[in-house]
């Protein structure tokens, strides 16, 4: 294909589920490639398998792509001259092309039943052979075909794969790739109901939409020789193909949608309060890397840098720890108001703040979130991070290490003195709390960890956390005094 041809790429999902991290990566790399080359990014919906399509599947794809920060030049919602952009609306385009292959003797009608095909495959497996269609309907006469149809058999249409050919293409990721035609077998291009199969519809659509490059996961690489054969049959020039390595989990196994231990759908990350810019950044580095060690880039920087030559030949590791780190880098840069907006729905969902906040409660939420602004990785994390602010004094328990600290003989004296200091304060602000702790130090003679750690553990229930005076201010006078009093009564 001529290198000067306008770059036109597509993301072509099936509306059979929600936007998966792997599909999002395919869309993102195509988007970056198009924008880097001032080309066109097209969304095409491959919805011919009606039984597998789900309600809202198409909407989920589009909504979440937009949320991630992608836009497109043509698609079901952006009309263009190459439409329709749903395969289910292109049947009138496919039918004459299928008939053309039949008329030219490049395809034929197959009357085999599923039972016959299953039996054929099982026999081949038992003989240690690669399962592929035997071609037994390939040489049926017109009379034999008519007899089959008179008996009520509906044919599928199979492509005649030429014998003894090597199908070779230069892949953007894998370099030269070859397949032997003898290992493919005549494949179905139209089902018994006349609906074209994936490989036929994709090849036709990519040609008619003038797709210049096909960048997709390498689970599609076995489809490529079939699509090239279809291109050749029509005398069309194939696009340039690129097959990205798959995404694997920490066990180096292919990321499976059935693995519930890993969050894999974009909608789930949205619901947890991840930032679209951070997910964009993380996904863009799944199997692609720029020069240098930097890992945080804007969308504009990714567009400027993107080069498919830097796509990895090794599987991309999905590292959830890395994702939360990336998201934290973005959260830290947000203004506090934005972090509050990110956190508030999760606090409300947990029932720890009101559904309708007055100004005083909203101000308090700002103080709470400010304690965790630097630490927070995503919106929903505010709930477990801040749970000690909502616990009742009676429900606070101490682990072995905390219990050991509180067993020191000076602790009751420190806690009593601190309680007395707080009771004398009219306003519980961080500066006043800090001064009160200093007075306790002077009064008791206890300092350092022996002073701060018992106060922290009794008031917050934790050995580590936000700066202690600030945490006590946010906890509030009543709650802190209640916790101090409860501990003293029980000890």
UniProtKB/Swiss-Prot annotation:
GO terms for molecular function: ATP binding; glutamate-tRNA ligase activity; tRNA binding; zinc ion binding. Keywords: Aminoacyl-tRNA synthetase, ATP-binding, Cytoplasm, Ligase, Metal-binding, Nucleotide-binding, Protein biosynthesis, Zinc. SUPFAM superfamilies: An anticodon-binding domain of class I aminoacyl-tRNA synthetases, Nucleotidylyl transferase. Pfam families: Anticodon_2 (PF19269), tRNA-synt_1c (PF00749). Binds 1 zinc ion per subunit. It is found in: Cytoplasm. It catalyses: tRNA(Glu) + L-glutamate + ATP = L-glutamyl-tRNA(Glu) + AMP + diphosphate. GO terms for cellular component: cytosol. Monomer. This is Glutamate--tRNA ligase. It comes from Listeria monocytogenes serotype 4b (strain F2365). The gene is gltX.
């Amino acid at each position: 294909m001529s290198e000067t041809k306008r770059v036109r790429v597509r993301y072509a999902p099936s509306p059979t589920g929600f936007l998966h991290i792997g599909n999002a990566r395919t869309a993102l790399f195509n988007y970056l490639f198009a924008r880097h080359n001032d080309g066109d990014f097209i969304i095409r919906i491959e919805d011919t398998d009606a039984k597998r399509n789900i309600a809202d599947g198409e909407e989920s794809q589009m909504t979440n792509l937009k949320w991630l920060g992608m836009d497109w030049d043509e698609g079901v919602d952006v009309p263009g001259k190459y439409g329709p952009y749903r395969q289910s609306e292109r049947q009138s385009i496919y039918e004459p092309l299928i008939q053309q292959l039949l008329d030219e003797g490049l395809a034929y009608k197959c009357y085999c039943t599923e039972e016959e095909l299953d039996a054929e495959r099982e026999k081949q497996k038992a003989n240690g052979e690669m399962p592929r269609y035997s071609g037994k309907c390939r040489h049926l006469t017109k009379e034999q075909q008519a007899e089959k149809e008179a008996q009520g058999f509906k044919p599928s249409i199979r492509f005649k794969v030429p014998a003894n050919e090597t199908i070779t293409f230069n892949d953007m990721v894998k370099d030269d790739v070859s397949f032997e035609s003898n290992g493919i077998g005549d494949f179905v291009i139209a089902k018994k109901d006349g609906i074209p199969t994936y490989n036929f519809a994709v090849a036709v659509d990519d040609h008619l939409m003038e797709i210049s490059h096909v960048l997709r996961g390498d689970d599609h690489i076995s489809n490529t020789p079939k699509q090239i054969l279809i291109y050749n049959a029509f005398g069309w020039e194939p696009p340039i193909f690129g097959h990205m390595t798959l995404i694997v989990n920490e066990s180096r196994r292919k990321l499976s949608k059935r693995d519930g231990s890993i969050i894999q759908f974009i909608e789930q990350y949205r619901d947890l309060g991840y930032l679209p810019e951070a997910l964009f950044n993380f996904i863009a580095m799944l199997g692609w890397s720029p020069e240098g060690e930097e890992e945080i880039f804007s969308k504009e920087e990714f567009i400027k840098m993107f080069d498919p030559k830097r796509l990895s030949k090794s599987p991309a590791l999905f590292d959830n720890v890395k994702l939360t780190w990336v998201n934290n880098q973005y959260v830290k840069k947000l203004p506090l108001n934005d972090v509050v907006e990110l956190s508030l729905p999760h606090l409300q969902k947990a029932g720890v703040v009101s559904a309708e906040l007055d100004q005083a409660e909203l101000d308090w939420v700002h103080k709470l979130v400010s304690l965790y602004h630097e630490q927070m990785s995503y919106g929903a994390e505010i709930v477990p991070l801040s749970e000690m602010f909502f616990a009742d004094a009676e429900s606070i328990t101490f682990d072995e290490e905390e219990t050991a600290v509180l067993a020191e003989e000076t602790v009751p004296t420190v806690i009593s003195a601190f309680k007395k200091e707080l009771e004398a304060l009219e306003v519980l602000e961080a500066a006043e709390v800090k001064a009160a702790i200093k007075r306790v130090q002077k009064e008791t003679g206890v300092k350092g960890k022996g002073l701060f750690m018992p106060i922290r553990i009794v008031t917050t229930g934790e050995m580590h956390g936000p700066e202690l005076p600030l945490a006590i201010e946010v906890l509030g006078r009543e709650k802190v005094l209640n916790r101090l009093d409860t501990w003293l009564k029980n000890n």
